[in-house]
């Protein structure tokens, strides 16, 4: 519970800094994601565990990328291009395929990588695992768009955060569920704030 509260605290700070377009989104986020990699492994939410490991790597990438384009720790915001959307589609498809495969093979993995007495099949998927597959893809795309400083990242965060509220409540992670409720609210505020900033500092459209 203590680790969960600490992870929630730094996760909250990270989303707040993201809302402000402040580069501190990444160091605070790294602390949170590392803690949640351990917690999600413990709760057998492998999809979200993998996405938090991905968050850690993307946070380092985003930190470097933002540092090159930041002025007084505040970054320049832009809209998603056609090429970006193709990349998003590829990332989403990869995530859906990979995480589905991980859950499909879960009985084999939990049996110390032995097929003895193991039955594989989609009928063994838990309802929360289907949701986990979907939200993992949403968050993966959202994280990449945030690293690229695209305003549309907030749309993915809003949808993913909202879905995650009942998911973690079902898993008994009360503080994490509450965190995602706050994340949903902050993500909506972040989208509004970034949109206002973008309107005041227009960027030429790209194809």
Protein language model annotation of sequence segments:
Residues 11-14, 22, 26-62:
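Early transmembrane hairpin module of multi-pass membrane proteins
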Residues 1-21, 25, 69-73, 77-207:
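Polytopic alpha-helical membrane-helix bundles and their juxtamembrane interface segments
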Residues 54-71, 194-195:
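Membrane-water interface of transmembrane alpha-helices
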């Amino acid at each position: 519970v203590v680790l969960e509260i600490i992870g929630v605290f730094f996760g909250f700070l990270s989303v707040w800094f993201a809302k402000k377009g402040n580069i501190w989104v990444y160091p605070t986020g790294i602390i949170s994601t590392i803690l949640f990699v351990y917690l999600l492994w413990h709760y057998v939410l492998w999809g979200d565990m993998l996405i938090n490991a991905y968050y850690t790597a993307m946070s380092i990438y985003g930190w470097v990328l933002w540092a090159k384009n930041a002025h007084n720790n505040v970054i320049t915001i832009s809209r998603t291009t056609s090429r970006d959307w193709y990349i998003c589609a590829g990332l989403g498809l990869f995530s859906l395929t990979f995480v589905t495969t991980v859950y499909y093979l879960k009985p084999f993995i939990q049996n110390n990588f032995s097929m003895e007495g193991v039955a594989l099949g989609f009928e063994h998927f838990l309802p929360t695992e289907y949701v986990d597959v979907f939200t993992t893809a949403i968050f993966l795309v959202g994280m990449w768009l945030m690293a690229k400083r695209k305003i549309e990242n907030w749309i993915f965060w809003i949808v993913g955060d909202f879905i995650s509220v009942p998911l973690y409540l079902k898993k008994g992670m009360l503080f994490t569920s509450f965190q995602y409720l706050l994340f949903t609210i902050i993500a909506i505020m972040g989208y509004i704030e970034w949109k206002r900033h973008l309107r005041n500092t227009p960027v030429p459209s790209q194809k």
